[in-house]
Swiss-Prot record:
Keywords: Amino-acid biosynthesis, Arginine biosynthesis, Cytoplasm, NADP, Oxidoreductase. One of its GO terms (molecular function) is NADP+ binding. InterPro entries: AGPR_AS, AGPR_type-1, NAD(P)-bd_dom_sf, NAGSA_dehydrogenase, Semialdehyde_DH_NAD-bd. This is N-acetyl-gamma-glutamyl-phosphate reductase. The gene is argC. The lineage of its organism: Bacteria, Thermotogati, Thermotogota, Thermotogae, Thermotogales.
Amino acid sequence: MIRVGIIGATGYTGLELVRLLKNHPEAKITYLSSRTYAGKKLEEVFPSTLENSILSEFDPEKVSKNCDVLFTALPAGASYDLVRELKGVKIIDLGADFRFDDPGVYREWYGKELSGYENIKRVYGLPELHREEIKNAQVVGNPGCYPTSVILALAPALKRNLVDPETILVDAKSGVSGAGRKEKVDYLFSEVNESLRPYNVAKHRHVPEMEQELEKISGKKVNVVFTPHLVPMTRGILSTIYVKTDKSLEEIHEAYLEFYRNEPFVHVLPMGIYPSTKWCYGSNHVFIGMQMEERTNTLILMSAIDNLVKGASGQAVQNMNIMFGLDETKGLEFTPIYP
């Protein structure tokens, strides 16, 4: 059994980790941490978890003694210093602290200096692209939700040099859970219900993460213009991506089928079928569709994921499976909830 700890167990991604790991045949939750609810049983605060473990303040000695792997489900900037205190424990960070190759990029977009970053061996945890590196990783930076949906949608086209990477336009829409459990007027029911609005236009922190990984795939400079929108639903991300090409839709579609042929969670839809967030609700599955706007030679890619599962906690469990030599679908085999 893999002994598992979770820091930030009472946020949305932390609670999703609890749900997934309680049903994992090879994992046992041995440590749960929450500053807000320290001293309480998790099921006292969230009865749906059916988990009677007592929440505690972060204690690096207890983590090192009781855990083989630690999931850190904390806001950006909160995990880095905690992780540096730990020895002999594998780390999967669901925040942004270990996603970037260049600490200067993190400093520019997140406003924090990561002292000693270059001494930490870390891997960007997108299994479909970095599976071999993840196998031997000690620290994994779990990808962001928007980058997961965008990178997986673009990877085959960029890898095969089928599109122009110079300007990639991304219009993405996310459910409110993507904002976390923080108290903010913008996320009150009356503010969100029956409303659709863009946010962080031209300055979203996920842009450099997308560009970093897409440039690795293409070997060329990539420019992403990204506009996210908040929609009145709980879960899900739908990303619509516009990119120039001189290839046919049939050639591109065939390349996608080949690229993802052996991937258990990525599904390339038949031409003319477009994804819905309802199809991946509560699951680790990704659905990708495409169409060609022939007047302008524009390829339109569409991807749907559950932001809390493949966009966060499910992908983290997938990474854990790979790190410990398990079938990466362990604990994630379930189909989406529908309707």
